[in-house]
Amino acid sequence: MMKKPVVIELAVVVLAAVVAGGYWWYQSRQDNGLTLYGNVDIRTVNLSFRVGGRVESLAVDEGDAIKAGQVLGELDHKPYEIALMQAKAGVSVAQAQYDLMLAGYRDEEIAQAAAAVKQAQAAYDYAQNFYNRQQGLWKSRTISANDLENARSSRDQAQATLKSAQDKLRQYRSGNREQDIAQAKASLEQAQAQLAQAELNLQDSTLIAPSDGTLLTRAVEPGTVLNEGGTVFTVSLTRPVWVRAYVDERYLDQAQPGRKVLLYTDGRPDKPYHGQIGFVSPTAEFTPKTVETPDLRTDLVYRLRIVVTDADDALRQGMPVTVQFGNEAGHE
């Protein structure tokens, strides 16, 4: 009879142990959270001159740290300086022609055109009268048909000269045609565009660093003649620092943009970096070999981009990283 209470007490103890163990396991899972594995993104850019030419100088070498806006190299500027001077001269010529078209004709030019009409009119009147007389003489058989034809030709030439002078005077008095003004304006705009291109080409003969980074390779040396777009430097971008990781679909709800995480490296396992998820791929892919584990080889995963908010020089591109989604990280 005494065994029954002992059994009951033993059952209670076992049940309590199971409950306590389950609670500890649950809390442990909650505290540890989701763990992912990834790498610091390798981000490089090839730098080149947008124009071609002979390399005049290079200011940096492999391993140098560079800053955005820093001059990295220069081509021979002389050909582009000459092209710029030619473009400026072209604008001056086009501007002068356009101004003349807008201003029209001066009073002196109009007076000269009127005098030319008067002179041409007198010449025509004389030629017409002479032709009339020659017609009478030809009818009386005093002159030959050839003499009459010469008189007619002189009259016709004088008439054409008079018409040309009259047209010129009419143009001077009415000003330039709108079509001529529009053509002069278009020529000016074309010259201005050529000037802008020449200025840009001269500017692009200097290579400027687009962002901070570290110079990985220097592909050419001074004296090299480059085609436009030929690679001069390869630069590793140091800021911002991104970590690429992959999450299984089962845990996708925990890896939302804006979620804060802790990032551990082998070199400093007790001092994590801090990061924030900036991007989650909308499409799934098979686990890349760089983060492949035996239980994930056939899994479809989603790529994450994590922005490291406190990166330093110890965090190098390509370095393996452990991403911890603990509660502490998620609510910092």
Swiss-Prot record:
Organism superkingdom: Bacteria
Q: Which GO terms describe its cellular component?
A: periplasmic space
Q: Which residue spans adopt a coiled-coil conformation according to this UniProt entry? A: 108-209
The record's subcellular location field reads: Periplasm
Keywords from the UniProt entry? Coiled coil, Periplasm, Signal
Assigned protein family:
Belongs to the UPF0194 family.
- The entry's protein name is UPF0194 membrane protein YbhG
Which organism's genome codes for this protein? Answer: Shigella sonnei (strain Ss046)
Gene that produces this protein: ybhG
